[in-house]
A protein has these predicted regions:
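Intrinsically disordered, low-complexity, compositionally biased regions/tails
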Residues: 13-15, 25, 56, 61, ...
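Short, polar/charged, Gly/Pro-enriched helix-capping and turn/loop motifs at alpha-helix termini
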Residues: 54, 61-62, 154, 303
Protein backbone atom coordinates (compact mmCIF):
# COMPACT_ATOMS: atom_id res chain seq x y z
CA UNK A 1 0.00 0.00 0.00
CA UNK A 2 2.80 2.42 0.92
CA UNK A 3 4.61 1.73 -2.36
CA UNK A 4 1.40 2.42 -4.26
CA UNK A 5 0.85 5.72 -2.47
CA UNK A 6 4.42 6.86 -2.96
CA UNK A 7 4.21 6.00 -6.64
CA UNK A 8 1.07 8.04 -6.94
CA UNK A 9 2.85 11.05 -5.48
CA UNK A 10 4.76 11.19 -8.76
CA UNK A 11 1.73 12.54 -10.64
CA UNK A 12 3.41 15.93 -10.92
CA UNK A 13 6.24 17.85 -9.28
CA UNK A 14 5.54 19.73 -6.11
CA UNK A 15 5.28 23.49 -6.26
CA UNK A 16 8.05 25.54 -4.70
CA UNK A 17 6.86 28.68 -3.00
CA UNK A 18 8.99 31.61 -1.97
CA UNK A 19 8.56 33.64 1.19
CA UNK A 20 6.22 36.56 1.22
CA UNK A 21 6.51 39.84 3.06
CA UNK A 22 5.79 40.75 6.64
CA UNK A 23 3.62 40.06 8.53
CA UNK A 24 2.72 36.83 6.72
CA UNK A 25 5.51 34.57 5.54
CA UNK A 26 5.67 31.11 4.02
CA UNK A 27 8.68 28.86 3.85
CA UNK A 28 9.44 26.73 0.81
CA UNK A 29 7.62 23.43 0.54
CA UNK A 30 9.04 20.46 2.33
CA UNK A 31 9.94 17.19 0.58
CA UNK A 32 7.35 14.51 -0.04
CA UNK A 33 5.33 13.85 3.07
CA UNK A 34 5.30 10.33 4.42
CA UNK A 35 2.06 8.38 4.32
CA UNK A 36 0.44 6.62 7.24
CA UNK A 37 -2.05 4.15 5.76
CA UNK A 38 -4.04 3.78 8.93
CA UNK A 39 -7.61 2.64 8.91
CA UNK A 40 -10.21 5.37 8.46
CA UNK A 41 -10.40 7.47 11.59
CA UNK A 42 -13.14 9.90 12.61
CA UNK A 43 -12.37 12.43 15.36
CA UNK A 44 -14.79 14.03 17.80
CA UNK A 45 -16.73 16.98 16.48
CA UNK A 46 -18.67 18.31 19.46
CA UNK A 47 -16.67 21.53 19.30
CA UNK A 48 -17.36 22.04 15.61
CA UNK A 49 -21.08 21.37 15.99
CA UNK A 50 -21.32 23.87 18.85
CA UNK A 51 -19.29 26.60 17.15
CA UNK A 52 -20.90 26.10 13.76
CA UNK A 53 -24.41 26.34 15.16
CA UNK A 54 -23.56 29.51 17.03
CA UNK A 55 -21.86 31.38 14.19
CA UNK A 56 -24.09 30.20 11.37
CA UNK A 57 -27.26 30.92 13.32
CA UNK A 58 -28.77 27.49 12.71
CA UNK A 59 -27.91 24.07 14.12
CA UNK A 60 -26.19 21.47 12.01
CA UNK A 61 -24.87 17.96 12.46
CA UNK A 62 -21.17 17.15 12.42
CA UNK A 63 -19.52 15.07 9.74
CA UNK A 64 -19.20 12.11 12.08
CA UNK A 65 -22.97 11.68 11.96
CA UNK A 66 -22.81 11.75 8.19
CA UNK A 67 -20.59 8.69 8.27
CA UNK A 68 -22.25 6.67 10.99
CA UNK A 69 -23.56 3.32 9.78
CA UNK A 70 -27.28 3.36 9.20
CA UNK A 71 -27.54 7.15 9.07
CA UNK A 72 -29.17 8.72 5.99
CA UNK A 73 -26.79 10.41 3.58
CA UNK A 74 -28.95 13.51 3.17
CA UNK A 75 -28.08 15.05 6.56
CA UNK A 76 -26.88 18.65 6.01
CA UNK A 77 -23.29 19.53 6.85
CA UNK A 78 -21.55 22.68 8.01
CA UNK A 79 -21.42 25.89 5.99
CA UNK A 80 -17.67 26.38 5.43
CA UNK A 81 -17.34 30.19 5.35
CA UNK A 82 -18.34 30.98 8.97
CA UNK A 83 -16.04 28.23 10.21
CA UNK A 84 -13.15 29.63 8.15
CA UNK A 85 -13.48 32.89 10.08
CA UNK A 86 -13.55 31.03 13.39
CA UNK A 87 -10.54 28.93 12.36
CA UNK A 88 -8.59 32.02 11.29
CA UNK A 89 -9.30 33.75 14.59
CA UNK A 90 -8.05 30.68 16.48
CA UNK A 91 -4.61 30.77 14.86
CA UNK A 92 -1.60 32.00 16.77
CA UNK A 93 0.67 34.53 15.03
CA UNK A 94 3.14 31.69 14.41
CA UNK A 95 0.46 29.59 12.74
CA UNK A 96 -0.70 32.50 10.59
CA UNK A 97 2.86 33.03 9.40
CA UNK A 98 2.84 29.55 7.86
CA UNK A 99 -0.65 29.16 6.40
CA UNK A 100 -1.99 32.68 5.79
CA UNK A 101 -1.32 35.03 2.89
CA UNK A 102 -2.23 38.50 1.79
CA UNK A 103 -5.18 38.55 -0.61
CA UNK A 104 -3.13 39.49 -3.65
CA UNK A 105 0.00 37.50 -2.81
CA UNK A 106 1.96 36.46 -5.88
CA UNK A 107 4.67 33.86 -6.26
CA UNK A 108 6.85 33.20 -9.31
CA UNK A 109 3.82 31.83 -11.16
CA UNK A 110 1.55 34.79 -10.48
CA UNK A 111 -1.51 35.27 -8.26
CA UNK A 112 -1.28 32.31 -5.90
CA UNK A 113 -4.98 32.11 -5.01
CA UNK A 114 -5.75 31.53 -8.70
CA UNK A 115 -3.18 28.76 -9.12
CA UNK A 116 -4.16 25.12 -9.67
CA UNK A 117 -2.18 21.88 -9.81
CA UNK A 118 -2.96 18.18 -9.74
CA UNK A 119 -0.61 17.31 -6.91
CA UNK A 120 0.57 20.04 -4.59
CA UNK A 121 0.56 21.55 -1.15
CA UNK A 122 0.50 25.33 -0.91
CA UNK A 123 1.77 25.20 2.67
CA UNK A 124 3.88 22.80 4.71
CA UNK A 125 1.76 21.93 7.76
CA UNK A 126 -0.25 18.77 7.15
CA UNK A 127 -3.77 18.75 8.56
CA UNK A 128 -3.32 15.60 10.66
CA UNK A 129 -0.13 16.87 12.27
CA UNK A 130 0.64 18.39 15.64
CA UNK A 131 0.81 21.81 14.02
CA UNK A 132 -2.94 22.24 14.51
CA UNK A 133 -4.85 21.84 17.76
CA UNK A 134 -7.59 19.23 18.08
CA UNK A 135 -10.29 21.90 17.81
CA UNK A 136 -8.63 23.40 14.72
CA UNK A 137 -8.43 19.98 13.08
CA UNK A 138 -12.12 19.44 13.69
CA UNK A 139 -12.96 22.80 12.16
CA UNK A 140 -10.77 22.10 9.13
CA UNK A 141 -12.47 18.75 8.62
CA UNK A 142 -15.93 20.32 8.81
CA UNK A 143 -14.85 23.07 6.39
CA UNK A 144 -13.47 20.56 3.91
CA UNK A 145 -16.49 18.29 3.87
CA UNK A 146 -18.75 21.33 3.75
CA UNK A 147 -17.55 21.81 0.16
CA UNK A 148 -19.31 18.60 -0.85
CA UNK A 149 -22.86 17.35 -0.98
CA UNK A 150 -23.45 15.10 2.06
CA UNK A 151 -24.28 12.15 -0.19
CA UNK A 152 -20.69 12.29 -1.48
CA UNK A 153 -18.84 12.37 1.84
CA UNK A 154 -18.20 8.62 1.94
CA UNK A 155 -16.98 8.65 -1.66
CA UNK A 156 -14.61 11.54 -0.95
CA UNK A 157 -13.23 9.66 2.05
CA UNK A 158 -12.64 6.62 -0.15
CA UNK A 159 -10.79 8.74 -2.69
CA UNK A 160 -8.61 10.22 0.03
CA UNK A 161 -7.95 6.80 1.53
CA UNK A 162 -6.86 5.41 -1.84
CA UNK A 163 -4.80 8.43 -2.90
CA UNK A 164 -3.37 9.83 0.33
CA UNK A 165 -3.72 7.20 3.02
CA UNK A 166 -6.82 8.87 4.44
CA UNK A 167 -8.33 12.26 5.07
CA UNK A 168 -5.82 14.83 6.30
CA UNK A 169 -2.77 12.60 5.85
CA UNK A 170 -1.34 14.62 2.96
CA UNK A 171 -3.57 17.69 2.80
CA UNK A 172 -2.72 21.22 3.78
CA UNK A 173 -4.63 24.48 3.98
CA UNK A 174 -4.05 28.09 3.02
CA UNK A 175 -6.08 31.20 3.78
CA UNK A 176 -5.85 34.32 1.64
CA UNK A 177 -7.04 37.70 2.89
CA UNK A 178 -9.07 38.11 6.07
CA UNK A 179 -12.06 35.80 6.62
CA UNK A 180 -15.17 37.74 7.55
CA UNK A 181 -14.37 40.53 5.09
CA UNK A 182 -15.25 40.73 1.40
CA UNK A 183 -11.80 39.45 0.45
CA UNK A 184 -10.83 36.01 1.67
CA UNK A 185 -10.34 32.51 0.34
CA UNK A 186 -9.79 29.14 2.01
CA UNK A 187 -7.96 26.55 -0.09
CA UNK A 188 -7.27 22.91 0.74
CA UNK A 189 -4.71 21.12 -1.40
CA UNK A 190 -3.19 17.67 -1.71
CA UNK A 191 -2.90 14.86 -4.21
CA UNK A 192 -5.98 14.90 -6.43
CA UNK A 193 -7.51 17.64 -4.27
CA UNK A 194 -7.90 21.39 -4.64
CA UNK A 195 -11.10 22.89 -3.22
CA UNK A 196 -11.91 26.48 -2.32
CA UNK A 197 -14.49 28.62 -0.58
CA UNK A 198 -14.53 32.40 -0.45
CA UNK A 199 -18.02 33.67 0.35
CA UNK A 200 -18.20 35.07 -3.20
CA UNK A 201 -15.10 37.23 -2.71
CA UNK A 202 -14.16 36.32 -6.30
CA UNK A 203 -17.53 37.38 -7.65
CA UNK A 204 -17.08 36.15 -11.22
CA UNK A 205 -15.84 32.65 -10.37
CA UNK A 206 -17.63 29.43 -9.55
CA UNK A 207 -16.04 27.47 -6.68
CA UNK A 208 -14.07 30.60 -5.76
CA UNK A 209 -11.56 29.76 -8.50
CA UNK A 210 -10.23 26.76 -10.40
CA UNK A 211 -10.56 23.40 -8.66
CA UNK A 212 -9.16 19.94 -9.21
CA UNK A 213 -10.33 16.47 -8.27
CA UNK A 214 -9.20 12.98 -9.20
CA UNK A 215 -8.84 9.39 -8.10
CA UNK A 216 -6.53 6.43 -8.70
CA UNK A 217 -8.63 3.69 -7.14
CA UNK A 218 -6.91 0.34 -7.65
CA UNK A 219 -3.68 1.39 -9.29
CA UNK A 220 -1.91 4.26 -11.03
CA UNK A 221 -2.80 2.62 -14.36
CA UNK A 222 -6.47 1.79 -14.10
CA UNK A 223 -8.32 -0.83 -16.11
CA UNK A 224 -10.75 0.14 -18.84
CA UNK A 225 -13.77 0.04 -16.53
CA UNK A 226 -11.96 1.97 -13.75
CA UNK A 227 -13.12 -0.33 -10.91
CA UNK A 228 -13.74 1.50 -7.66
CA UNK A 229 -13.17 4.96 -9.10
CA UNK A 230 -15.71 7.25 -7.49
CA UNK A 231 -15.69 9.70 -10.41
CA UNK A 232 -15.90 7.25 -13.33
CA UNK A 233 -19.69 7.49 -13.45
CA UNK A 234 -19.26 11.01 -14.83
CA UNK A 235 -17.42 9.62 -17.85
CA UNK A 236 -20.09 6.96 -18.33
CA UNK A 237 -22.72 9.72 -18.51
CA UNK A 238 -20.69 11.59 -21.11
CA UNK A 239 -20.15 8.47 -23.19
CA UNK A 240 -23.88 7.84 -23.21
CA UNK A 241 -24.19 11.12 -25.10
CA UNK A 242 -21.60 9.97 -27.63
CA UNK A 243 -23.57 6.77 -28.24
CA UNK A 244 -26.67 8.68 -29.37
CA UNK A 245 -24.84 11.03 -31.74
CA UNK A 246 -25.23 10.48 -35.47
CA UNK A 247 -22.27 10.02 -37.80
CA UNK A 248 -21.83 13.70 -38.63
CA UNK A 249 -22.07 14.70 -34.99
CA UNK A 250 -19.52 12.08 -33.96
CA UNK A 251 -17.16 13.38 -36.60
CA UNK A 252 -17.37 16.84 -35.02
CA UNK A 253 -17.09 15.56 -31.45
CA UNK A 254 -14.27 13.03 -31.83
CA UNK A 255 -10.80 14.60 -31.75
CA UNK A 256 -7.58 12.59 -32.35
CA UNK A 257 -5.54 13.95 -29.44
CA UNK A 258 -6.40 15.67 -26.19
CA UNK A 259 -4.79 18.98 -25.26
CA UNK A 260 -2.47 19.08 -22.28
CA UNK A 261 -4.66 18.61 -19.24
CA UNK A 262 -3.41 21.86 -17.73
CA UNK A 263 -4.74 23.87 -20.68
CA UNK A 264 -7.90 25.04 -18.97
CA UNK A 265 -7.58 28.76 -19.52
CA UNK A 266 -10.46 30.31 -21.46
CA UNK A 267 -9.95 30.67 -25.19
CA UNK A 268 -9.52 34.16 -26.64
CA UNK A 269 -12.28 33.38 -29.13
CA UNK A 270 -15.16 30.93 -28.94
CA UNK A 271 -14.20 29.91 -32.47
CA UNK A 272 -11.05 28.33 -31.02
CA UNK A 273 -13.07 25.79 -29.02
CA UNK A 274 -13.16 22.34 -30.61
CA UNK A 275 -15.85 19.68 -30.51
CA UNK A 276 -19.57 19.40 -31.17
CA UNK A 277 -21.63 22.48 -30.30
CA UNK A 278 -24.47 21.63 -27.93
CA UNK A 279 -26.80 23.94 -29.88
CA UNK A 280 -26.46 21.55 -32.82
CA UNK A 281 -27.84 18.62 -30.83
CA UNK A 282 -31.39 17.33 -30.91
CA UNK A 283 -33.77 17.91 -28.02
CA UNK A 284 -33.16 14.41 -26.64
CA UNK A 285 -29.40 14.81 -26.92
CA UNK A 286 -29.54 18.15 -25.11
CA UNK A 287 -31.47 16.50 -22.30
CA UNK A 288 -28.68 13.94 -21.98
CA UNK A 289 -26.14 16.77 -21.87
CA UNK A 290 -28.05 18.31 -18.99
CA UNK A 291 -27.66 14.97 -17.20
CA UNK A 292 -23.91 15.13 -17.84
CA UNK A 293 -23.75 18.60 -16.32
CA UNK A 294 -25.79 17.47 -13.33
CA UNK A 295 -23.42 14.53 -12.85
CA UNK A 296 -20.40 16.83 -12.93
CA UNK A 297 -21.68 19.21 -10.27
CA UNK A 298 -23.41 16.56 -8.15
CA UNK A 299 -20.47 16.02 -5.72
CA UNK A 300 -20.45 19.65 -4.63
CA UNK A 301 -22.55 21.68 -2.21
CA UNK A 302 -25.79 23.21 -3.46
CA UNK A 303 -24.51 26.81 -3.46
CA UNK A 304 -21.62 25.87 -5.76
CA UNK A 305 -23.94 23.95 -8.06
CA UNK A 306 -26.14 27.05 -8.29
CA UNK A 307 -23.12 29.25 -9.02
CA UNK A 308 -22.01 26.96 -11.85
CA UNK A 309 -25.42 27.13 -13.49
CA UNK A 310 -25.48 30.89 -13.02
CA UNK A 311 -22.13 31.24 -14.80
CA UNK A 312 -23.27 29.01 -17.66
CA UNK A 313 -26.44 31.08 -18.07
CA UNK A 314 -24.38 34.29 -18.19
CA UNK A 315 -22.44 32.98 -21.20
CA UNK A 316 -25.55 31.94 -23.14
CA UNK A 317 -26.36 28.59 -21.58
CA UNK A 318 -25.12 25.09 -22.28
CA UNK A 319 -25.93 25.62 -25.97
CA UNK A 320 -22.80 27.78 -26.22
CA UNK A 321 -20.57 24.95 -24.99
CA UNK A 322 -18.95 22.17 -27.00
CA UNK A 323 -18.16 18.60 -26.04
CA UNK A 324 -15.06 16.79 -27.29
CA UNK A 325 -14.09 13.14 -26.96
CA UNK A 326 -10.44 12.22 -27.48
CA UNK A 327 -9.22 9.10 -29.23
CA UNK A 328 -5.88 9.29 -27.45
CA UNK A 329 -5.74 7.48 -24.13
CA UNK A 330 -8.56 5.05 -24.89
CA UNK A 331 -7.84 2.40 -22.25
CA UNK A 332 -8.66 -1.03 -23.63
CA UNK A 333 -9.34 0.39 -27.11
CA UNK A 334 -13.04 -0.07 -26.39
CA UNK A 335 -14.20 3.31 -27.73
CA UNK A 336 -15.47 4.24 -24.32
CA UNK A 337 -13.62 7.52 -24.32
CA UNK A 338 -11.60 8.00 -21.15
CA UNK A 339 -10.61 11.55 -22.02
CA UNK A 340 -13.20 14.19 -22.84
CA UNK A 341 -13.96 17.84 -22.30
CA UNK A 342 -16.92 20.17 -21.97
CA UNK A 343 -15.96 23.73 -22.86
CA UNK A 344 -17.59 27.10 -23.42
CA UNK A 345 -16.56 30.77 -23.59
CA UNK A 346 -15.97 30.87 -19.81
CA UNK A 347 -16.36 27.21 -18.91
CA UNK A 348 -13.85 24.34 -18.94
CA UNK A 349 -14.46 20.92 -17.42
CA UNK A 350 -11.56 18.77 -18.59
CA UNK A 351 -11.83 15.07 -17.76
CA UNK A 352 -8.67 13.01 -18.19
CA UNK A 353 -9.44 9.38 -17.47
CA UNK A 354 -6.15 7.81 -18.54
CA UNK A 355 -4.12 6.43 -16.83
CA UNK A 356 -6.44 7.37 -13.94
CA UNK A 357 -8.91 10.17 -13.35
CA UNK A 358 -7.78 13.79 -13.28
CA UNK A 359 -10.45 16.49 -13.57
CA UNK A 360 -9.68 20.19 -14.03
CA UNK A 361 -12.43 22.78 -13.61
CA UNK A 362 -12.40 26.48 -14.46
CA UNK A 363 -15.72 28.34 -14.58
CA UNK A 364 -16.57 32.04 -14.59
CA UNK A 365 -19.23 34.41 -15.84
CA UNK A 366 -16.49 36.44 -17.52
CA UNK A 367 -14.36 34.91 -20.33
CA UNK A 368 -11.56 37.37 -19.55
CA UNK A 369 -10.90 35.79 -16.14
CA UNK A 370 -7.27 34.67 -15.80
CA UNK A 371 -5.97 31.66 -13.87
CA UNK A 372 -2.71 29.72 -13.64
CA UNK A 373 -2.60 25.95 -14.18
CA UNK A 374 0.57 23.86 -14.19
Amino acid sequence: MIDKLIAHRLDSPLLSLTKIGVPMELNSLSPLHSFTPNSLQISRRHFVRTVGAAIAGTPFLGTNQLLTAGQPESIPSAIPEPLVKKLYESFTPAQKSKVCFNWDHKDKHGLLRQHIRANWNITEPIVNSDYFTKDQKEMIEAIFFGHFDPSWHKKIRKQLQDDQGGYGEDQSIAIFGTPGTNQFQFVMTGRHTTVRCDGDSAEHLAFGGPIFYGHAADDFNEKANHPGNVFWEQAIKANQVYKILDGKQRQAALIPAAPAETKIQFKKSANDITGLQISEMTKDQKQEMQKVLSSLIEPFRTSDQTEVRKCIKAQGGLDQCRISFYQSGDIGNDQVWDNWRLEGPAFVWHYRGAPHVHVWVNISDDPHTQIIAS
